[in-house]
């Protein structure tokens, strides 16, 4: 929705509300809630914030994200500071009022024409009642400036073969019980809605048939804005909010999506990680920004990405399986934490180095590449990270000094090295060739770094640190010379947080370009 409103010349910002008690998303396991998306200011948020930034080209801040925990925390802090002037502070109205205040601050700061607020969870859940109450209060105060979009799902049971509208009817009525009437219903389904279903939903949910927007499964998520415009959604929203269109221009977006659909040749990438499985299901959401960044870069290199998830623990159980990596054009190891699966990742890295398979390591993937090189080339037997082995003889990866203080206090939430930091690139390196400038700014999320005590020895052994902090203390990028390997690069930061469909990240572009050459 934000994308199509931008195409009409409006400035847009977005806010995500998550109804859990966690103050932010930083302490949750990726298999529990998906990827933790880090904003430029270092705030750890829900993966949806990444979608907002990728679709709308925004740089959001902590003002654009709230949880039940963060709202209650602010209200309690204000009460302790006597900001309520001795009043009895109650769940209602003070929690909804704090929510409204947060929304207005974010909207004012962005100076946007439209602020889109997503309330997470499902209608009928107890957790989001207070956020719905805040929304009701906003509508009551200024009815012409607030509208509601209800996203529902219309199942098509296999044994029946008919699209069912009852769940949507029930959701709309449950929303009504919170004092809210939907202005639009976005109906998700496997197939497009027919007119009969639209009319049935309109009658039972008290809206016009044209306000029921069909949202079928599409080939690419980037088709969604184009699909919405088939139902003229932006026109309807502008009319409802009494806003004037300044232009109509989705042309560049439509052109890119059309190009993607015409792609024939593929590029095969293996993603070796450990946050894939949840019970009997595979959860790719744990690495959603990496996945989207690979797609962006593949499209720009005129390739369809063929991604395969590999659980690194399987290489620990059966090292012979490493041979399967030979069938891929490139291997990527994303960020992670802890000891599980580490040795499997190191085995995969060693295989890529020896077999000259393009390798891209992100955060932990960079640290483990340094460990692999230290063990087998620099001759530091047993080299490790103190995150895994606190008593290792060769701690080539060690905790940042300021992080020791935080961990001693058990201050785990929001205390890592987070957000944007600058780095300087070394001339003549793969990294320097990939970027348009030698000074870069990237987003970080880590407690551990390359141990400065081992940098000289690793360099002498042939490892190139092609990116460092401006003071030269922190190693931000490690790579092998192109004379030894076509593409072997590890980065301490998270480039996936700054890639978009229309502007892929330089390092992902370079990685995919190298991968496309492997088959030749």
Say what each PLM segment does.
Residues 1-303, 313-330, 338, 345-351, ...:
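Flexible phosphate-sensing "switch/lid" loops adjacent to ATP/NTP-binding sites
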Residues 3, 324-422, 428-430, 501, ...:
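Cysteine-nucleophile active-site neighborhood
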Residues 85-96, 335-342, 416, 420-422, ...:
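Short acidic-aromatic active-site loops that bind/stabilize oxyanions
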Residues 181, 208, 265, 327, ...:
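A generic structural signal for well-ordered coil/turn residues at beta-strand boundaries
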Residues 246-249, 360-361, 379-387, 432, ...:
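Acidic/polar loop patches that form or flank catalytic/metal-binding clefts of enzymes
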């Amino acid at each position: 929705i934000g994308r199509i409103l931008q195409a009409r010349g409006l400035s847009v910002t977005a806010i995500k509300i998550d109804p859990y008690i966690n103050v932010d998303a930083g302490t949750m396991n990726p298999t529990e809630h998906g990827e933790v998306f880090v904003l430029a200011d270092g705030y750890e948020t829900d993966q949806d914030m990444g979608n907002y930034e990728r679709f709308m080209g925004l740089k959001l801040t902590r003002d654009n994200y709230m949880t039940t925990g963060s709202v209650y925390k602010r209200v309690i802090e204000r009460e302790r500071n006597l900001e309520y002037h001795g009043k009895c502070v109650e769940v209602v109205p003070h929690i909804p009022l704090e929510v409204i205040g947060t929304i207005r601050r974010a909207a004012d700061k962005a100076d946007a024409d439209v602020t889109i607020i997503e309330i997470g969870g499902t209608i009928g859940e107890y957790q989001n009642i207070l956020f719905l109450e805040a929304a009701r209060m906003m509508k009551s105060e200024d009815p012409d400036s607030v509208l509601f979009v209800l996203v529902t799902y219309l199942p098509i049971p296999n044994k029946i073969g008919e699209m069912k509208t009852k769940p949507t009817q029930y959701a709309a009525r449950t929303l009504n019980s919170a004092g809210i009437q939907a202005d639009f219903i976005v109906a998700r389904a496997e197939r497009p809605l027919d007119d009969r279903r639209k009319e049935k939903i309109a009658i039972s949910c008290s809206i016009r048939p044209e306000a029921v927007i069909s949202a079928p499964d599409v080939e690419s998520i980037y088709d969604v804005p184009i699909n919405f415009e088939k139902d003229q959604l932006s026109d309807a929203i502008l009319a409802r909010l009494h806003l004037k269109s300044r232009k109509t221009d989705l042309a560049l977006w439509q052109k890119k999506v059309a190009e993607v659909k015409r792609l024939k040749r593929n590029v095969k990438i293996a993603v070796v990680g450990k946050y894939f499985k949840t019970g009997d299901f595979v959860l790719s959401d744990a690495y959603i920004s990496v996945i989207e960044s690979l797609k962006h870069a593949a499209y720009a290199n005129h390739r369809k990405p063929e991604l395969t998830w590999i659980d690194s623990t399987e290489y620990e159980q059966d090292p012979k399986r490493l041979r399967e990596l030979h069938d891929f054009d490139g291997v990527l190891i994303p960020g992670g934490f802890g000891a599980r699966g580490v040795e499997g990742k190191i085995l995969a890295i060693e295989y890529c180095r020896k077999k000259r398979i393009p390798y891209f390591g992100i955060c932990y993937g960079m640290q483990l590449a340094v460990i692999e090189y230290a063990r087998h080339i620099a001759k530091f037997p047993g080299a490790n990270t103190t995150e895994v082995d606190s008593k290792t003889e060769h701690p080539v990866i060690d905790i940042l000094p300021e992080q020791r203080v935080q961990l001693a206090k058990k201050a785990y939430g929001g205390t890592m090295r987070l957000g944007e930091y600058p780095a300087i690139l070394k001339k003549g390196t793969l990294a320097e060739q990939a970027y348009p400038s030698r000074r870069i700014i990237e987003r970080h999320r880590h407690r551990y770094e390359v141990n400065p005590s081992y940098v000289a020895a690793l360099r002498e052994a042939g490892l190139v640190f092609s990116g460092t902090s401006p003071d030269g203390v922190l190693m931000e990028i490690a790579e092998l010379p192109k004379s030894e390997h076509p593409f072997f690069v590890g980065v301490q930061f998270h480039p996936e947080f700054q890639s978009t469909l229309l502007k892929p990240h330089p390092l992902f572009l370079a990685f995919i370009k190298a991968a496309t050459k492997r088959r030749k």
